[in-house]
Curated annotation (Swiss-Prot):
Site residues, Cleavage: G251, C252
Name of protein: Protein hedgehog
Subunit structure: Interacts with shf.
Enzyme class: hydrolase
Gene3D superfamilies: 3.30.1380.10, Hedgehog/Intein (Hint) domain
InterPro entries: Hedgehog, Hedgehog_Hint, Hedgehog_sig/DD-Pept_Zn-bd_sf, Hedgehog_Signaling, Hedgehog_signalling_dom, Hint_dom_C, Hint_dom_N, Hint_dom_sf
Domain of life: Eukaryota
Site, Involved in cholesterol transfer: residue positions: D297
Compartments it resides in: Nucleus; Cytoplasm
A GO cellular-component term linked to this record: nucleus
A biological-process GO annotation: imaginal disc-derived wing morphogenesis
Amino acid sequence: MDNTSSVPWASAASVTCLSLDAKCHSSSAKSTASSISATPESQTMRHIAHTQRCLSRLTSLVALLLIVLPMNFSPAHSCGPGRGLGRHRARNLYPLVLKQTIPNLSEYTNSASGPLEGVIRRDSPKFKDLVPNYNRDILFRDEEGTGADRLMSKRCREKLNLLAYSVMNEWPGIRLLVTESWDEDYHHGQESLHYEGRAVTIATSDRDQSKYGMLARLAVEAGFDWVSYVSRRHIYCSVKSDSSISSHVHGCFTPESTALLESGVRKPLGELSIGDRVLSMTANGQAVYSEVILFMDRNLEQMQNFVQLHTDGGAVLTVTPAHLISVWQPESQKLTFVFADRIEEKNQVLVRDSETGELRPQRVIKVGSVRSKGVVAPLTREGTIVVNSVAASCYAVINSQSLAHWGLAPMRLLSTLEAWLPAKEQLHSSPKVVSSAEQQNGIHWYANALYKVKDYVLPQSWRHD
């Protein structure tokens, strides 16, 4: 992850970019020669179109490099267990003992799999949210013969598939066995996440009980939200509901939260546009204005659970649990970034001083939660933003501000190159341009792609799962 590791690929990328640029200009020259009689306006439009095609190719190349290269880092660099990608674990994993659960909390707490949301029947509206799992590396017992054991929530399927891969790496020739998933026959008492497709009961295909402690550990590493070595005969795992995990997918603020524009005007995040310059923070904790280059998530209708941080100076920040917040460490005199739901009272966050305009530490005096409508996640060129006077990262899920900022480099490059292009409206007959903020509704495609690959390239200790 250090700077020296990026030199080889940067050189290769530069050569490739030069090649692409040469091809694009060569194509442009041929086109110009074949149409000498064309008007200056048509030549300008053709040049813009060629430049945009070069830009698209270049951006795709850089994005591919930044996604693929972390997969080639050694386990020592990534500090990870090495599951997936066929590597052996770089650190020892200890099996769970009988009756042990991880985390050591009630299954229905928010820090584990969360509360029950209601039984799902075949005639329930939520039944369509269950998805079948046809992974050939998993055996499904399916005693009922209805295929019910293949049905589960999307999050449960994602974690189960990761676990199946880990089982094959740990014990070649052995497959993961699912003995129970979604239950429509009420075999598990009155309260069970099996009825919602959020729980699975698992074993190994050889039924070797000596493997079950390690199987439970692999389930924890795969990202299940609650794992219990409840019986010598099987392992029980469950996950948060799909409706609640969006707070773990991307970090967002409420649309009513405000950012300070360079003009001195406070603007609600729900009204921000691409190109707005808002108050942000440098890596050294200095206040600076930075351009909004895209929205990683924007949905003004989505209901969401938020964490609320109250400071002794009266600032209140409302943010999703997985969002990174700047925290000042007075003992070491260092600035760190911590997930919002892991900030405690007496921690110090950076807040803008209304008199000097500088960012100063203020003590957190209360940490609460609230459910509200709408999510907005602007990305600035600096990778940080000051919201409701509190300094925060633009990133979430990954417990590393620098790594997350590095991962969004292609989008910053794209924004820079687009700024060099002639005005896009020259390519259209209508001069009206609709802002990206008005068009976007949902998660940005690039942010979503990074989220999907994180489980394969980052250790669980780096993720907010």
